Amino acid sequence: MEEDLKLQPDSETLTTPNSEVGAVELVKHEEENEQVEQDPGYVTPPEDGKEPVAALSEPNYLGGEDDVLLKHIARQSTIVREALKECTQTPLTVEELSRAYEANLFSPRVPPKKQPNGTCETNPRLNFYPVFAVPEALATYHIFFKNQRIPLSCRANRTRGDGLLHLKAGAHIPEIVSLEEVPKIFEGLGKDEKRAANALQKNETENQNVLVELEGDNARLAVLKRTIEVSHFAYPALNLPPKVMRSVMDQVLIKRAEPIDPQQPDLNSEDGQPVVSDDELARWLGTQDPSELQERRKMMMAAVLVTVELECLQRFFANPQTLRKVEESLHYAFRHGYVRQACKISNVELSNLISYMGILHENRLGQNVLHCTLQGEARRDYVRDCIYLFLILTWQTAMGVWQQCLEEQNLQELNKLLVRARRELWTSFDERTVARQLANLIFPERLMQTLQNGLPDFVSQSILQNFRSFVLERSGILPAMSCALPSDFVPLCYRECPPPLWSHCYLLRLANYLAHHSDLMEDSSGDGLLECHCRCNLCTPHRSLVCNTELLSETQVIGTFEIQGPEQQEGASSLKLTPALWTSAYLRKFIPEDYHAHQIKFYEDQSRPPKVPLTACVITQSQILAQLQAIQQARQEFLLKKGHGVYLDPQTGEELNTPSLSAAASCRSQKHATQGKQASHRATAIPAETTKAVGRGGDVGRQPGRGSFRRGGGGADGELGQPRRGGPRGRGGRNHRQRQGTIFQKTRSEPTSENYPAPATATMFTESQP
């Protein structure tokens, strides 16, 4: 009972001290024999200022003078203190503190250090940031969307969409259009689409849902249309940088309306007025017809708001070098083709590499084989949507860099260029000409090349999946409860798409072209050499083991030789074909002459040979490669046919001429057959001693140390591992242990008597033998 009356010691993890003002203690009520709470009032703190530490009630490895759990708070406090160093004033709100915290974590002034393998070292400061949160400091341009009503002619309402998007050999890269070329837009279902029977009654009362149940819907779209009801979608922003478009609008079309200053009202008199007046435009065009002037203004408006954006998109993505790098990134994202072949030979998962803004990272948590779980139309829709999102992510990254790099001085120079070219723009021949001239001013060649050199990034399917969920959530669609893809809400052609969404239509068509051009729509791999086969121009024929025989021969001699220079020469280098060396050369192997960027032109569909001869990666001379392969094959045959005894690899110590157990069984059966023929003329009952003599008989048996195809001879009844009595050595010692592990090396067709001595140079081989 006395133990129950004592004060219980505080737990070490508590933050409230024992001597706190107003602390509560338990006492014993004498009359009722029960515990009651009493306030002892103010307790005088200790003179030294340190609180007494209560002893632990039970052993705890986290205790001691310094509580290890406090290190977690100390580290976080250090990070917050570093984030506040650059602030001129102490943040007073959570928003300001979060902005400073994210800027210090994700946008430091000093870039992260690079490791020897090229990736950035891990940042332990990120351990305190929410794991699955999207930092606002990184999503500078990706948070902008274009909320618009979904066209009734979108991909989800086209039952024959997969067939319309199918591209055959010879198809070309998609082009852009203008409003002059496509003056009329159709956004209906079309006469070929038939509503489902249960969708007629449903849509009578629900007119807000754009997705219509059709008879020919596939399984995914049928489930999607029964799961969600949507009318608008948040399309990711593809606009040019706002700073650039503001200058274009102010100097070409119409001046912005600024807030009216009551003290100086005359300064804002021209706000909201056209930059080019009717009189000035009539003088430039040489006509006074109001209809012609109005048509010219419509053309300029369409060129500035729609066509110039398409022109910049096409210039950026249609470049052959950009297309090649985009397809290379897709091969990494889908672990496809030559990337899969390199991973197999190097035994390194190259698809774990991701990058952003030119900084390379290694992330082993990403997935790159998710598309392998799908078949048919579902796989094609998923691959097409992944590439569509990848193109959007790449373009938004470029626009974000462009927006952040622009200073006030750059905008002033741009305004001067636009003012100088104003008359030329307004008097151009057509809409496409205006868009090209305007793109030359705002998107010059130097800027485009700079962005193309740093883009696109390496991504994984997990990154694209997170981006997909981010887009769907902004549109009010719960990804976990629906099987929607952002590309489902984009029309398939320009004449069925409203002009504000033409950029998305172009990227969807370009994604479909890249999916076919990269041979991602279908699985072309097989067994054997076809395990990593891909028909695209990046892989076939120069990187394909099926088509390039010299490349196949080179892979067979990887790690089997080492060429050394003269020892007397200083700095003499050696050549050793390692998997890492071969993989690096294999990834860099690209033949631009046989790469057809703007047309689907697979090697297997061509009747002509490649423009550049097929060669290996490292050893490009076929004579040297053939000689190395012949040497390797001769050494293997020598060890298999004429080698006796045990040959050890000087580097690994493994036995080089140890055959399989099947060879030993075949030789044992051959020996029993020979013994049966020699003893057929004798009586049935033969003593054991006679049988042993027959087993060792013949010319081979009389040679000491050469009996029964092995050093040390054979046993009484053909068993392995027993020394013969005429052998030069006994059972014991190291030589006996080596002979125990030796098995047959001869085949049935070889003679039973050979006098070839063991090669004296066998132990000097530096090649790795099978």
Curated annotation (Swiss-Prot):
Posttranslational modification: Might be cleaved by the viral protease. Phosphorylated. Tyrosine phosphorylation enhances preferential binding to tripartite leader mRNAs and allows ribosome shunting.
Start-end of Basic residues biased regions: 726-739
Modified residues (Phosphotyrosine): Y332, Y647
Keyword Nucleotide-binding: no
Main location: host cell
InterPro entries assigned: L4
Note, other: All late proteins expressed from the major late promoter are produced by alternative splicing and alternative polyadenylation of the same gene giving rise to non-overlapping ORFs. A leader sequence is present in the N-terminus of all these mRNAs and is recognized by the viral shutoff protein to provide expression although conventional translation via ribosome scanning from the cap has been shut off in the host cell.
HAMAP family: ADV_SHUT (MF_04060)
Name this polypeptide is given: Shutoff protein
Gene it is expressed from: L4
